[in-house]
Amino acid sequence: MIHPGHILFLLLLPVAAAQTTPGSCSGCGSLSLPLLAGLVAADAVASPLIVGAVFLCARPRRSPAQGDGKVYINMPGRG
């Protein structure tokens, strides 16, 4: 189900976009095609590396086997 606030945001988005003047970015330059292709390629390489690192760090690890064969003094039933 869509939250009513999200619908209101989507309806007001064109109004906000219409109020911005075109070319209002001072000091912004256009990106050359090789630079844009390099950014996309770097993102394509970095994203799977980040996902893989998060997967390796977040996966459940096997806990080492508890030493049930140990003899416990002062613990009845364990020895």
Curated annotation (Swiss-Prot):
GO-annotated molecular function: phosphatidylinositol 3-kinase binding; signaling receptor binding
Species name: Macaca mulatta (Rhesus macaque)
Pfam families, A to Z: DAP10
Region spans: GRB2 binding site: 72-74
Origin organism lineage: Eukaryota, Metazoa, Chordata, Craniata, Vertebrata
Keywords: Disulfide bond, Glycoprotein, Membrane, Phosphoprotein, Signal, Transmembrane, Transmembrane helix
Region PIK3R1 binding site, residue ranges: 72-75
Spans through the membrane: 35-55
Quaternary state and interactors: Homodimer; Disulfide-linked. Heterohexamer composed of four subunits of HCST/DAP10 and two subunits of KLRK1. Interacts (via transmembrane domain) with KLRK1 (via transmembrane domain); the interaction is required for KLRK1 NK cell surface and induces NK cell-mediated cytotoxicity. Interacts with PIK3R1 and GRB2. Interacts with CLEC5A. Forms an CLEC5A/TYROBP/HCST trimolecular complex depending almost solely on TYROBP. Interacts with CD300H.
Residue ranges annotated as Extracellular topological domain: 19-34
Domain of life: Eukaryota
Protein name: Hematopoietic cell signal transducer
Function field: Transmembrane adapter protein which associates with KLRK1 to form an activation receptor KLRK1-HCST in lymphoid and myeloid cells; this receptor plays a major role in triggering cytotoxicity against target cells expressing cell surface ligands such as MHC class I chain-related MICA and MICB, and UL16-binding proteins (ULBPs); these ligands are up-regulated by stress conditions and pathological state such as viral infection and tumor transformation. Functions as a docking site for PI3-kinase PIK3R1 and GRB2.
Sites of Phosphotyrosine modification: Y72
Signal peptide range in chain numbering: 1-18
Mode of membrane association: Single-pass type I membrane protein
